[in-house]
């Protein structure tokens, strides 16, 4: 069953993606049509308080003009032929964002239009990527010296106009990037990142004017001496060519990397002859033996295979962490090789550097420039690293960035502060800290600063690493990187801070949101519910319950066993089952409703997530979320190195790379009738009711009949409305019902159940439920943070982390140079509102590990009127509350007495004692806090009924046809005369008027008369035939058509009895009114009773009435 097509644009199917994928404008409203009612074009007078919507990166140096310009009816995107594709793309995009029909055109622009202009004479001013915007009486002008410059200008136009404001202030700006390279590392190394994800990632980069992506990945090896390396993950040449083509269209340079001579396990695991052996003879598949000419040749062959696929002028060889976890002392053969190759006194570092230089020479012969990570630069005796190699600096050990500047190397800033990792919690880009602490492109790892204007500093990038990859799905990564991507965009293009704080920038980037490609991507193309999936019969006959997950996948539950489908067993890379031919299995169902912060269940949870994609002929593909291979019914003919040792039996379901399967990887999903519910916010308090969306789905092959959705809430909760009735839902469609729910007195966990019943009979058809958590308090605004100390050297753990609403970050007391001792405290200003009091303090310990959580704590509260800031408070008085916390990472709450001051207050949370590294060990002297907050009593609001959708699909009953009449020019008394070769148009009218008006037409003799589906009659040959119109339920009416030759005078249209002389009856006046040439099957004119008799004979005398339904 396909997902209901009436979903609102930009809403990502599942509640948590709606509520959260979330941040970052993922759910920004589709249209902005209500934002402006002004006429399109320029106005000399701007509306009062009109401001220019923000863009990311910012357009600094804006010069205000006079007046304003409005996008509206009649606005076009006008360009030359050379920019026609850009114009069409922008027009389509703005149409969807604004609900204004915008066309692309070539020719001259008017003041209503957006014009795109390519002006090569602006190259000196704008460079290769810059653009100029002019907003005024000539419309909105986008000018670039290059195609990409114009394209980047359209990105800013789109961002401004997608935020709900269609009137822009007049003005002008010219902007170009501060740095040449602005982008990201995307490591599809060992595990696969889907091509869908890469496609969306490129769209996001383009929207942010980012132009560089380093892609560490495997192009499927196909040479005789490399094809044993075709283990998963890999990409085919067609895969790569498609996303490289898109990247080039966006001005993005995609640079491939095969890391060497370290991190080579996915290339060398089946080639032991190329692996480096240690002094004991043990080989390591991660290490290429650079002393072996055949191993070096193998690497160069891999480089050759990438020829003709990528368009970049660069090659990246990695060159990092060759000896990670060991040292050259364990590989004495490299010392011997170095001395032989590079002379007396040479070291393994010389051999390592010589290998890099050799690869540099090899790729230069191909017209490419080499790039490496900075830990490829080591101290040497006899060999110097070539100066034309670009150094991407990520790691502070070894040679310092300033030394490399002095030596004249070209540098890119790839600091670890801009890293994400699926498993390593320390690698989470903290955009707020970086922005607020004035990080810039000259700030290298460890805070080492070089001149940000160094002429060989190419720019900076973020890096997205997999590591132990089961901790996050790629969709969770997509959500996580939103802020950091926008931060690096701002820092590398504009190198400025036009927002006073990160919170100000964050508000704008959330309002701008994602570009169109990401908003339009359908993560869950079928509704949650029960489905028959016959192709899975080798696992279970089902049926299967599909449950949507917060990150846009499905959990697939076998309703027979109660267990869930998982891809859990098989050989792995980075802790993910990458084995080609691995078989899915049924396991106990994990809770997939939780997010990535629940790390202890990540492996069970994420191996039960499946990506379903719509494919051809109404069928679907199914992929494990972590592996991105395809489930398929094995044929026994698949070819892959993994299948040489483990091959699934033909007819069983297993995972295979997409290029190894075809129609055997297509699945039929036949839906049962069902119901599901999602909630906007699971946390509810009397001041903040939550909206529940109930979706009722019809089976794929049957309408539902009229149904009613009725909620049942526990005591202490209220819900409106009391029920929602839905008209019969057409087969394969879904309808929506909305409910608002709030807790009045209830607290803690609660379940709201929904019953689906047949409206007429009351028969129960199904149930569903949502889980909520009720609180009678709410978080209050916190500001003006302070702490007794904070650690920013050993790790980045400032006090602001305890108030950033992110459980994955934390504040830590200072523990380096020197460490601070107990007691430790954090303080902040709490603002519950005038006349209100804070009621409690909540504390959450760091979530990555338990290494000494708070044990004995005290809370102090003073009126904010007593001091100008937290730092100015000199007398905190006595604690208003104390508590003993258990040894746990769970949220702890401390109730406060009613004697504290009302209104704004300063709060100090003091940790006097801490637990040890274990529950029984001695207490530690440090402290850490993930989240600290004050709560206040929630003031109840009146619960209202939500407006119900007006576009739910429904089956409408139409009256049965009771009769039909046929009319047309020349028709009289049910008869029509035509000359051979002529035509006539007949019309059928079904009674009653609101019955189905569709009829079928037929001729009793096609050799005499033919009739088409519209009722058009053609006279073919001399003779008589009947033309009949028949309704869907069998009612019919006919016209007798007589065809004559051209010279003939038409005779009677039906048989007549000869009359005897003197026996003719006088003509009498009809007792009923003639039917004006129309013949009715229900009350015919007495003059045509003979024809009526003939009609009934044709109709067969027995008509079965069928109720006609239509879907609207």
Swiss-Prot record:
Gene3D superfamilies: 2.60.40.1080, 2.80.10.50, Chitobiase/beta-hexosaminidase domain 2-like, Galactose-binding domain-like, Glycosidases
UniProt family annotation: Belongs to the glycosyl hydrolase 20 family.
Source species: Bifidobacterium bifidum (strain DSM 20082 / JCM 1254 / BCRC 11844 / KCTC 3440 / E319f (Variant a))
Domain BIG2 residues, every copy: 975-1041
GO biological process entries: carbohydrate metabolic process
Keyword flag Transferase: no
Record note on what altering residue 419 to F does: Significantly reduces both the affinity and kcat value for LNB-beta-pNP
Disulfide bonds: 187-189, 564-589
Signal peptide bounds: 1-34
pH dependence per the entry: Optimum pH is 4.5 with LNB-beta-pNP as substrate and pH 6.0 with PA-lacto-N-tetraose.
Molecular functions (GO terms): beta-N-acetylhexosaminidase activity; lacto-N-biosidase activity
EC number: 3.2.1.140
Membrane topology field: Single-pass membrane protein
Annotated beta-D-galactosyl-(1->3)-N-acetyl-D-glucosamine binding sites: 190, 216, 259, 320-321, 419, 467
Key word Protein transport present: no
Residues covered by region (Disordered): 938-969, 1044-1081
Name the record gives this protein: Lacto-N-biosidase
Active site: 321 (proton donor/acceptor)
Pfam families according to UniProt: Big_2, F5_F8_type_C, Glyco_hydro_20, Glyco_hydro_20b, RicinB_lectin_2
GO CC, alphabetical: plasma membrane
Main location: membrane
More info: HMOs function as prebiotics, promoting the growth of bifidobacteria in the gastrointestinal tracts of breast-fed infants, which in turn promotes optimal health.
Protein origin, superkingdom: Bacteria
Positions with biased composition (Low complexity): 1044-1061
Reactions catalysed according to its record: beta-D-Gal-(1->3)-beta-D-GlcNAc-(1->3)-beta-D-Gal-(1->4)-D-Glc + H2O = beta-D-galactosyl-(1->3)-N-acetyl-D-glucosamine + lactose
Keywords assigned: Cell membrane, Disulfide bond, Glycosidase, Hydrolase, Membrane, Signal, Transmembrane, Transmembrane helix
């Amino acid at each position: 069953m396909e997902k209901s097509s009436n979903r609102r644009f930009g809403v990502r199917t599942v509640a948590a993606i709606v509520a959260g994928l979330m941040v970052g404008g993922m759910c920004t409203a589709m249209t902005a049509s209500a934002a402006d009612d002004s006429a399109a074009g320029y106005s000399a007078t701007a509306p009062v308080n009109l401001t220019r919507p923000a863009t990311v990166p910012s357009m600094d140096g804006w010069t205000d003009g006079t007046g304003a310009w409005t996008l509206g009816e009649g606005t076009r995107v006008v360009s030359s032929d050379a920019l026609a594709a850009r114009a069409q793309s922008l027009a389509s995009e703005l149409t969807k964002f604004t609900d204004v029909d915008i066309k692309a055109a070539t020719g001259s622009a008017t003041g209503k239009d957006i014009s795109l202009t390519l002006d090569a004479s602006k190259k000196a001013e704008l460079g290769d990527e810059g653009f100029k915007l002019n907003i005024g009486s000539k419309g909105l002008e986008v000018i670039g010296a290059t195609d990409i410059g114009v394209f980047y200008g359209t990105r800013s136009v789109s961002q401004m106009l997608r935020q709900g404001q269609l009137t822009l202030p007049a003005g002008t700006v010219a902007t170009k990037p501060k740095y040449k390279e602005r982008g990201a590392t995307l490591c599809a190394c060992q595990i696969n990142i889907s091509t869908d994800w890469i496609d969306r990632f490129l769209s996001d980069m383009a929207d942010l004017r980012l132009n560089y992506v380093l892609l560490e990945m495997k192009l499927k090896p196909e040479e005789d001496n490399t094809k044993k390396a075709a283990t998963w993950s890999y990409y085919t040449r067609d895969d790569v060519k498609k996303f490289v083509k898109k990247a080039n269209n966006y001005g993005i340079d995609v640079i491939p990397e095969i890391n060497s001579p370290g991190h080579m396990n996915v290339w060398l695991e089946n080639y032991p002859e190329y692996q480096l052996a240690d002094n004991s003879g043990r080989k390591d598949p991660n290490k290429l033996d650079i002393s072996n000419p055949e191993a070096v040749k193998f690497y160069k062959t891999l480089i050759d295979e990438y020829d003709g696929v990528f368009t970049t002028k660069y090659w990246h060889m990695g060159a990092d962490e060759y000896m990670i976890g060991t040292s050259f002392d364990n590989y004495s053969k490299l010392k011997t090789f170095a001395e032989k190759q590079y002379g007396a006194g040479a070291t393994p570092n010389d051999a390592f550097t010589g290998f890099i230089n050799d690869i540099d020479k090899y790729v230069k012969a191909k017209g490419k420039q080499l790039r490496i990570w900075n830990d490829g630069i080591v101290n040497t005796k006899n060999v110097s690293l070539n100066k034309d190699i670009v150094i991407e600096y990520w790691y502070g050990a070894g040679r310092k960035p300033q030394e490399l500047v002095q030596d004249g190397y070209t540098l890119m800033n790839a600091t670890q502060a801009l890293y994400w990792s699926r498993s390593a919690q320390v690698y989470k880009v903290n955009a707020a800290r970086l922005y607020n602490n004035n990080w810039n492109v000259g700030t290298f790892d460890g805070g080492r600063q070089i001149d940000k204007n160094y002429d060989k500093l190419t720019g900076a990038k973020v890096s997205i690493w997999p590591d132990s990859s089961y901790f996050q799905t790629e969709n969770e990564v997509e959500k996580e990187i939103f802020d950091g991507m926008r931060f690096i965009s701002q820092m590398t293009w504009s190198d400025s801070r036009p927002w006073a704080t990160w919170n100000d920038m964050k508000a704008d980037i959330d309002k701008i949101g994602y570009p169109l490609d990401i908003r339009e991507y359908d993560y869950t193309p079928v509704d949650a519910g029960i489905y028959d999936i016959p192709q899975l019969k080798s696992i279970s006959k089902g049926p299967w319950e599909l449950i949507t997950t917060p990150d846009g996948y499905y959990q697939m539950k076998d309703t027979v066993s109660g267990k869930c489908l998982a891809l859990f067993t098989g050989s792995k890379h980075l802790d993910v089952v990458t084995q080609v031919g691995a078989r899915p299995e049924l396991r106990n169902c994990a809770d997939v409703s939780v997010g990535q912060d629940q790390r202890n269940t990540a492996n069970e949870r994420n191996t039960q997530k499946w990506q379903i994609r719509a494919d051809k002929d109404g069928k679907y593909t199914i992929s494990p979320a972590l592996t991105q291979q395809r489930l398929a019914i094995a044929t026994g003919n698949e070819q892959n190195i993994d299948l040489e040792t483990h091959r699934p039996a033909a007819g069983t379901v297993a995972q295979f790379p997409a290029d190894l399967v075809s129609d055997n990887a297509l699945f039929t999903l036949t839906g049962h009738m069902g119901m599901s519910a999602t909630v906007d916010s699971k946390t509810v308090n009397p001041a903040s009711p939550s909206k529940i969306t109930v979706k009722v789905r019809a089976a794929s092959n049957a309408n539902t009949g009229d149904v009613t959705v009725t909620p049942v809430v526990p005591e202490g909760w209220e819900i409106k409305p009391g029920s929602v009735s839905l008209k019969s839902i057409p087969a394969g469609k879904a309808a929506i019902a909305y409910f608002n729910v709030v807790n009045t007195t209830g607290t803690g966990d609660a379940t709201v159940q929904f019953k689906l019943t047949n409206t007429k009979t009351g028969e129960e058809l199904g149930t569903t439920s949502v889980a909520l958590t009720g609180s009678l308090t709410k978080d209050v605004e916190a500001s003006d943070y302070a702490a007794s100390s904070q650690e920013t050297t050993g790790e980045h753990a400032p006090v602001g982390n305890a108030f950033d609403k992110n459980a994955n970050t934390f504040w830590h007391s200072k523990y380096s140079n020197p460490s601070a001792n107990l007691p430790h405290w954090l303080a902040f200003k709490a603002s519950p509102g005038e006349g209100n009091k804070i009621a409690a303090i909540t504390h959450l310990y760091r979530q990555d590990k338990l290494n000494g959580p708070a044990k004995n704590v005290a809370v102090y509260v003073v009126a904010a009127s007593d001091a100008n800031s937290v730092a100015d408070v000199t007398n905190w008085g006595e604690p208003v509350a104390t508590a003993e916390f258990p040894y746990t990472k769970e949220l702890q709450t401390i109730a406060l007495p009613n004697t504290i001051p009302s209104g704004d207050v300063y709060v100090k949370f003091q940790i006097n004692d801490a637990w040890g590294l274990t529950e029984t060990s001695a207490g530690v002297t440090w402290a850490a806090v993930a989240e600290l907050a004050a709560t206040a009593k929630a003031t109840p609001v009146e619960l209202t009924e939500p407006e119900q959708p007006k576009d739910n699909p429904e089956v409408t009953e139409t009256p049965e046809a009771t009769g039909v009449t046929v009319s047309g020019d020349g028709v009289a008394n049910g008869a029509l005369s035509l000359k051979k070769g002529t035509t006539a148009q007949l019309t059928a009218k079904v009674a009653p008027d609101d019955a189905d008006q569709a009829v079928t037409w037929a001729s009793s003799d096609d050799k005499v008369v033919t009739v088409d589906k519209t009722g058009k009659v053609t006279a073919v040959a001399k003779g008589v035939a009947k033309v009949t119109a028949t309704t869907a339920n069998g009612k019919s009416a006919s016209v007798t058509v007589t065809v004559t030759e051209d010279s003939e005078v038409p005779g009677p249209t039906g048989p007549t009895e000869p009359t005897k002389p003197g026996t003719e009856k006088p003509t009498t006046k009809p007792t009923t009114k003639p039917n004006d040439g129309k013949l009715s099957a229900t009350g015919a004119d007495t003059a045509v009773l003979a024809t009526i008799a003939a009609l009934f004979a044709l109709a067969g005398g027995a008509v079965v009435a069928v109720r006609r339904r239509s879907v609207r």
